[in-house]
Structure formats: structure tokens, C-alpha cells
Amino acid sequence: MALASTVWDANLYLKFADARMRPALDLMGRLDPANAARAGHVIYDLGCGAGNISRILAERFPGAPVVGIDSSEQMLDKARSQTVDTRVSFAKGDLAHFKPDAPPSILYSNAAYQWLPGHIDMFPGLMKLLPSGGQLAIQMPRNHEAPSHALMRTAADAGPWAAKLKGIGGIARVEEPARYFDVLKPLSADLEVWETVYQQVLSGKDPVAQYTSSTGLRPFLEALSEPERTQFYDTYASLIAKAYPTRPDGITLFPFRRLFIVARRA
């Protein structure tokens, strides 16, 4: 497979929007509408990507301003081009050092903080930005022990590119649920931490490799130039096809574990 730019491709990411949308909506379903009604407060979508969820947050909580924060200019350009609701705006920012311009009522983040090493130590600071009763809502993939992610390292060590990919590990490790519970409990009036395994239904050629190429596989691809980039991808895709075989009906089932955290500030 010939690969195009290794910049985070918004169109490739959105190709799997349906598979990624359900966890985002499940997380949103635990938010309290009363928080969104706080005068002078803002809902922040941290790691907003192309803005799909930011726009849904605005629909879910009419009257509340929503600000999407992301580090990718390409994603932000996509988000702005597809957003007409004037209550929704976007800004470039570093999630590791997030400082809100306006007081937050809800800090929402879908599949972003797993990219940041040491993210668990950032969460108490996020909680302290909230008023009493405000909510922190976070979802992160916790699939790093599954073949889809373990085989990234196998492929990285299996070719002439091994030296270039040494030390690249993709997403940061997402801890056991109890670790997040223990860190956030002292600051929380209410705290929910749970996991869900989604059976994602994919189709087409190399569907799991295509899926991960816009997320966890991306750092490996970015570290290589052609022709090694395509050769590495093909090696990974071959390994993945054995771990997640295509069924006779053309469907590939891709189990994907995700961690959810919803904390209400004490």
C-alpha cells in the first residue's frame, strides 16, 4: 500500500468516525445538563480533532458555549470549515498545559489524553479548574495489550527500519481503572470509572491496519520515509490480518477496550 502524508490526516481519521463516535456519545450521556447551564461558564472539548464531538456537545447542551482545543492545525482547519454554530469555537492548545480562557463547567475529552505520558498526574489539576459540581469526563483507549497494538512493536523490530523505530511506543500506557479512581477520589463528590469493550465492525482491505494508521500506528509511520514507510506498513498489515481475520461475509470484528472516567468536583 502506498502511503501519503504522515501528517495526522483528518480525512483518514474521519473514515472511521462511526466506530469512534459511540464511545464519545456514551461518555456524553453521563454529563449533567445542569452544569452546561452555568452562566459565564464554557464546555471545553479537549483534543477536539475535527470538531465532530464539539458540535454534538453544542446540540446536546443548547445555550452553552463550546470551545474545542487541539494541537493539530489540520484538524482545527477541518473543524472550523464544518462548523456553522456560532456558539462553537476552536483554538490551538497543548493539553499537557491546558489553561482555560473562561471558567469551565465541563471538561470533556474523548480519546486524547492517552497520547500524553504522565497524563494521570494531569487529571487532579484539571479537576481543580472546575467549580464545585463541575464535571471532568474522559475516555481513553485501553487496547495497548491487544494484538492491534502489540504487533506494532513486533513489526517495528522486524525489518531494516528497527533502529529508526527504537524507542517509539505509540500511545502512552493507560493504567488500570483503580489507579484513576484513587487519584481523583479525593477531589470528587461523585466518581465513575468503567471499561467497555466495543466489537467494532470493519470492512475493506486491511481494515484494522487502516484504523490504527490514523491513531496508534501514526508515530511509527511518521518516523519513516519512503519506501520504508510502506514496507513497514505492509509488514504490520500482514501480521494484523492473521490476528483479526476477515470473516466469510467480508466483515472483520475488531474488539476495542476503552476506559471511561466521569468525576464531579467536590
Protein language model features and the residues they cover:
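Conserved alpha-helix/loop element of class I SAM-dependent methyltransferases that forms part
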Residues: 19-41, 56
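A conserved beta-strand element that flanks and buttresses the S-adenosyl-L-methionine
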Residues: 108
